[in-house]
């Protein structure tokens, strides 16, 4: 992976990289399109509400990564981990305090023209989500018209480009929107990193 600097006049704590293997992104798109039976209407913390979020998703659980069908996503998580290690190098405090985090279930998402995640949102908004520390996302294809990720508190808009990967704090400080896609198709894979919560995860940390 190659680190990308996001130009801003203020510190924003948004890590950005390009993955070296663009083929990986194409294979994840193929996985999505070849599994229509797994696709669901996009859900947010408000449930199914097209005014808040309008996408088509495939949810992926950690156990799914053990199945041959999802081998490509297991490889992807390995690439995401490399990005996180570089993120730690940029902020050494993370190495000493948060050396063990977990990736729970995540989504592959497809956007058609008119689709969006237009509601301003963050990933840590209640006691039920308080264990989330970071959010992450990889754009799986280039998008020419719309579909940017807008971190409005920082005046930062990220254009979707193949393999571009983001990691950012899950807090309200990094509330953002997924702007309306005006033409074409947009694919992403996205999820969270969290503190250990289950008994099994806590034992692994010890």
Task: Indicate residue ranges for each PLM-predicted region.
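Fe(II)/2-oxoglutarate oxygenase catalytic core
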Residues: 1-165, 173-206
């Amino acid at each position: 992976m190659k680190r990308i600097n996001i130009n801003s006049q203020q510190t924003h704590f948004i890590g950005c990289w390009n993955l070296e293997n663009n083929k990986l992104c194409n294979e994840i798109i193929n996985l999505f399109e070849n599994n229509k039976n797994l696709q669901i209407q996009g859900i947010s913390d408000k449930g199914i509400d097209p005014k808040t979020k309008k996408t088509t998703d495939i949810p992926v659980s950690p156990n799914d990564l053990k199945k041959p069908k999802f081998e490509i996503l297991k490889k992807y998580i390995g690439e995401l981990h490399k990005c996180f290690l570089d993120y730690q190098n940029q902020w050494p405090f993370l190495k000493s305090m948060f050396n063990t985090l977990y990736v729970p279930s995540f989504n592959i998402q497809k956007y058609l023209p008119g689709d969006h995640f237009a509601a301003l949102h963050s990933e840590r908004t209640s006691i039920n989500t308080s264990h989330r520390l970071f959010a992450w996302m990889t754009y799986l294809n280039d998008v020419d018209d719309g579909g940017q990720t807008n971190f409005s508190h920082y005046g930062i808009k990220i254009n979707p480009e193949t393999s571009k990967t983001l990691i950012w704090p899950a807090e309200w400080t990094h509330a953002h929107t997924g702007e309306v896609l005006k033409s074409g198709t947009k694919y992403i894979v996205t999820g969270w990193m969290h503190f250990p919560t289950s008994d099994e995860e806590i034992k692994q940390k010890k």
